[in-house]
Regions:
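Short coil/turn segments that connect the beta-strands within blades of beta-propeller domains
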Residues: 53-54, 101-103, 147-149, 195-196, ...
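Beta-strand-rich domains and repeat architectures in extracellular enzymes and scaffolds
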Residues: 38-65
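A short beta-strand motif characteristic of beta-propeller blades
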Residues: 35-41, 77-87, 123-131, 171-182, ...
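Short loop/turn segments that connect beta-strands within beta-propeller blades
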Residues: 70-74, 118-123, 165-169, 211-216, ...
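Blade-level signature of beta-propeller repeat domains, shared across WD40, Kelch, NHL, RCC1
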Residues: 310-338
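Repeated scaffold domains used in trafficking and secretory/extracellular systems
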Residues: 44-50, 90-98, 133-143, 184-193, ...
């Protein structure tokens, strides 16, 4: 009888241990894999990336700005680079964006003013100088026509700032012809635009949404969010994602009546600084935690699809079926295997 009891006790102990280990074993059925295509050494930290066809513009931190050709994706070719001295700035470059229709490149000196670079004469990069206000955290560029563009800046001092430029054929220069400021609910540190909708992130004060109609921009509402609202990504005129650092991320609706109903918080346990969107794929930049992948499940939930330790990630973008990750280790290009 004693022998049977001992054997039964031993069996139960094994069963308990087996059950515990089966519970803590990760379920890999719904995880997505990252397949590396190429890793580009960018000298300085790769802080940001902008893709336009086969051209990849890189904000290379202390190394300035770089232009890479990815006509052959597995063998990128460096076309040119501009150091901080050549750009006429002192601090690292943290953002780049390119207006392909007018062939103008824009970069941001960290916590300073945006920088304008003319690329209309082929591969020659002609620095036009800086504009707008100091303490610009992020900006967007919209072209008005072939000879005009407007820069929308998240000015950490003054709110939403607009600067319009027009090209003068006689002088072969771009001139700042108009501009004004719109006070925001707090000090903005991020911006995104889709159609007539503009959203600013306001750090501890959440976000503020604006609407543009017939050249007049008005504030529509402000939403307080957990954490520090860092960056916003608009996916259409009705929805957008907000990276809120240690509070993870939120998906929100732009309609005033839909604010509470459309609010979804996810990645609560991660430090999120940016969100890239490609249909059903979300790529969250998580600083030292790498890159986290998520998938929206309809309109009510967002599911985790894996965290990938690829180094310190600042920013990510989707383009042409690839995921471009701007990291301290350089620019890394991946394909997602679902």
């Amino acid at each position: 009888m004693t022998v049977i009891d001992i054997r039964m006790k031993h069996y139960l102990n094994l069963l308990i241990v087996s059950t515990i280990f089966s519970c803590i074993e990760p379920n890999s059925e719904n995880l997505w894999m990252l397949n590396e295509v190429v890793h580009i050494e960018t000298e300085g930290y790769c802080r940001d990336v902008f893709i336009s066809g086969d051209s990849v513009f890189v904000a290379a931190g202390q190394a300035g700005v770089q232009l890479w050709d990815i006509g052959t994706i597995t063998a990128p070719n460096l076309l040119w680079k501009k150091s901080l001295a050549e750009l006429g700035v002192n601090k690292e470059i943290t953002q780049v964006t390119y207006a392909s229709s007018i062939k103008q490149l824009f970069a941001l000196e960290s916590n300073e003013r945006p920088l304008h670079i003319d690329l209309s004469t082929g591969d020659t990069a002609r620095v036009q100088g800086q504009f707008s206000s100091e303490k610009t955290k992020e900006f967007r560029v919209l072209t008005n026509d072939g000879n005009s563009f407007t820069v929308y800046a998240a000015d950490n001092d003054d709110g939403l700032k607009l600067s319009t430029f027009e090209y003068d054929n006689g002088f072969d220069l771009w001139f700042n012809t108009a501009g004004y400021e719109i006070a925001s609910f707090g000090n903005p540190n991020g911006i995104d635009i889709y159609g007539n909708e503009i959203v600013l992130t306001l750090d501890q004060l959440g976000i503020e949404a604006f609407h543009s109609e017939n050249g007049i921009i008005t504030s529509r509402y402000q939403i307080d969010l957990e954490g520090n609202a860092r960056a916003v990504t608009m996916i259409n005129g009705g929805e957008f994602y907000v990276a809120c650092e240690d509070a993870g991320a939120f998906k929100l609706a732009t309609g005033i009546s839909d604010q509470l109903e459309g609010k979804i918080q996810f990645a609560n346990d991660l430090f999120v600084t940016h969100i890239a969107v490609n249909n059903n794929q979300l790529a969250l930049s998580c600083a030292s935690n790498g890159l986290a992948l998520y998938e929206p499940d309809g309109n009510t939930s967002i599911s985790a699809r894996g965290i990938h330790d690829i180094g310190y990630v600042y920013h990510a973008e989707f383009s042409g079926g690839y995921l471009f990750a701007a990291t301290r280790e350089g620019l890394q290009i991946f394909e997602i295997d679902e």
